[in-house]
Amino acid sequence: MGKVAALLLMAAIALAGCSRSGPPPISSGERYVAGQMTDMVYHLGAGDKIRVLVYNEPQLGGDFSVGADGEMSLPLIGNVPVAGKTIKQVSRDVQARLADGYLRDPRVSMEVQTYRPFFILGEVRAAGQYPYLSGLTAMNAIATAQGYTPRAARRTVRIRRFGDQYEQEYVLTPDLRILPGDTIRLTERFF
């Protein structure tokens, strides 16, 4: 009887080791699906490239990059903090700074030219940093990284959203959106 109890105990321990830890994966239908991107507010960050147009002042406009310090250096007014702000907020800030002793009634227009890159690591053939393209999904990102390795888990993906401290596991579906600055990690599957 002692051998049977010991065998059952060992089997229970072995099965407990196979159990999943942590919360279940989030269905991509719950967050960041393709149709919702237009409703989301994009916050600028390091690596973004912004096109600035100042009406009747072409020498003040151009394409400017957001530096690692979260600032963008513009002619005449110098460094402007932009990290964490929307394009509208930055446009208003620049307009106010230009109106403060430089131009009378300045009109400023801005748009994001190039978004910060996304990163993909783990069980893909070519892990690395890639340029973000509007409408990017997790499946597109995996294809950009030359597809899965033979050991890759193909049902879920882990994503750390830009600005978040932790990654979250998502069910891999065709509409799972990737955002600028996201880090995607494909894990190894268990046999």
Regions found by a protein language model. Give the residues of each.
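Ser/Thr/Pro/Gly-biased, low-complexity, turn-/loop-rich segments
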Residues: 18-191
